[in-house]
Amino acid sequence: MHTHASRPHARQSALPRRAALFDFPASADLSPDTGAARQHTIQWLSRFRVFENHASVEEYDALRFDVLTGLFYPRATGADLNLGSDLVGWYFVFDDQFDGELGCRPEEVARLVADVIRVTEEDMAPGGTGGGEGPLLESFRDLWHRINSGRPRVWRDRFRHHWLEYLHSYHREALERTGAAPADGGGDAPRSVEDVLALRRHSIGVQPCLDLNEPFGGYTLPSALHGGFPLARMREATDDVVVFTNDIASLDKELAVGDVHNSVIVQWKLAGGGVEDAVRHIAGLANARYGWFEETAARLPELLAEAGADPGTHRAVGRYVDGMRHVMTGNLGWSLRTARYDERGTEAVSGGRERPWARLTGAEDLIRAGRGAPPPPGSGPDTRQPMPSEPSQLA
């Protein structure tokens, strides 16, 4: 691939220029308790020994996940925002575990995913918790119990389903990364942007974040409404907008580390031409999704009235739609403010460097102890070939 996208000067100017391609706003609507949530989550992760020293804390803090949370939930305050901030912080700490050797070890990834899933199956009663498994699982157990405590069963089942989809996506990514599983196109078919979306809609972790809008807003959507048209399709559009935004924002970082689970990179490989052509194409797909979302949101009151929805349902759906909108515009707003995607973020993971909190699972010790080094990225069969089709437009 071309190398000019990795040069420092290009990195400094590329993201704002690329973000200007989006037709939707970059939110600046922050919860007033964002600063307090920032301190809370750093203390919470520190309590579970996620950070090895002060330098690790400073590196984490520069990524400003508190801002992402405050933009996702601008009306949440206090304990609710702290809970959302802990969820977002844990997400990214977990995600960073797979940037090194572990991400190329599907069997080890499957074991880790199974360990996390077991926590979701534990007794929620006091005293029904384990311990001693290390920072990642212990912090997740605390988070899981706090999120689910006192919630309605229908909500807890939905939330867990979305979590399982999220967790299993890491194993699938590891299989694809090592060539152990073909891309969804199969055979010799080229890999497409739609193939990337099929996996990234889960690995992006948007659905559990959307789920929190319900307890934070004091309502629970009925399953038929949540899973029916048009909300299910609006949630998918939200997934796609966040994926496309993230893939454009993180492009230089992922080019630097050789990650292939990026719609821009796949489109570039499929269509040829310059990388900025691929960026414009993906931005266009994001704009189409967002445009469809807003058109559908404008029709929702009429659709709900035709269905005989009561005023409480109208209010709940309106809040949920606002929550989806906050996630899309907030993700873009944060992407322009975080150090994760600027030149500092790219340099922080270049040359094989990992984040200081990237080895919390113990899997790397097992690998070094006798299971051999993982195959280098790209050494297996090429799984990055796209299919000759584009994702269908939401219309």
Curated annotation (Swiss-Prot):
Q: Give the Basic and acidic residues compositional bias ranges.
A: 346-357
Q: Which Pfam families match?
A: Terpene_syn_C_2
Report keywords, A-Z. Lyase, Magnesium, Metal-binding
Q: Where is this region: Disordered?
A: 346-395
Taxonomically, which superkingdom? Bacteria
Binding residues for Mg(2+) 2: D95
Cofactor(s), names only, from the UniProt record: Mg(2+)
Q: Which residues bind Mg(2+) 1?
A: D95
Enzyme class label: lyase
The record lists the catalysed reaction(s) as:
(2E,6E)-farnesyl diphosphate + H2O = (+)-isoafricanol + diphosphate
**Cofactor binding, note field:** Binds 3 Mg(2+) ions per subunit.
Give its E.C. classification number.
4.2.3.157
The UniProt record gives the binding positions of Mg(2+) 3 as N246, S250, E254
**What Gene Ontology molecular function terms does this protein carry?**
metal ion binding; terpene synthase activity
- Give the similarity note: Belongs to the terpene synthase family.
Q: What does this protein do?
A: Catalyzes the cyclization of farnesyl diphosphate (FPP) to isoafricanol.
Q: What is this protein called?
A: Isoafricanol synthase
